[in-house]
A protein has these predicted regions:
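Elongated alpha-helical scaffolds
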Residues: 96-105, 109
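Conserved short "hinge" loops at termini or chain/domain junctions
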Residues: 1-87, 113, 120, 124-136
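Conserved acidic
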Residues: 39-42, 94, 98
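Short, mixed-charge amphipathic alpha-helical segments
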Residues: 84-97
Length: 136
């Protein structure tokens, strides 16, 4: 028997995580331009790139997806199918891991590279997402 859960991620949650994680960077680096609402289109583009990478890695589990980047309702809804009964907290844990992964991917591409603190955090949360999906 397969079990299905839906993961709903609001893009505002991702942007808030980006702003929160990225606030110290301009203070630490005088040449950094900072992430704010004026450069939101760049941030949205980076989030989409990270989401494409993450979805490719999760493709074996995803049975449906509705990615909506419209102005009125900006959210991501993923239907995930698992072979074993999921824990009650799995949808929330996956959402949190994906939000953190996408925020750090965005910051990695804006401020650093794979070896930066953001690159390390991106890999950590990406792995956490996949482990949450594959755990018994």
């Amino acid at each position: 028997m397969n079990y299905r859960i839906d993961i709903v991620i609001d893009l505002d949650d991702i942007q808030q995580a980006i702003y929160t994680e990225g606030t110290w960077h301009p203070a630490d680096n005088a040449t950094a331009w900072g992430v704010n609402h004026s450069n939101e289109p760049i941030v949205d583009r980076r989030v989409r790139e990270g989401l494409d990478d993450l979805l490719a890695r999760m493709s074996g589990y995803i049975v449906s997806q509705n990615i909506n980047f419209n102005i009125d309702s900006q959210n991501i809804v993923l239907g995930v199918e698992l072979r074993k009964r999921p824990l009650l907290s799995l949808a929330r844990d996956l959402k949190n891991a994906m939000v953190s992964a996408l925020a750090n991917y965005t910051l990695m591409t804006l401020y650093g590279d794979e070896d930066s603190i953001y690159g390390t955090a991106w890999r950590l949360h990406r792995a956490r997402t996949l482990l949450l999906l594959s755990r018994p």
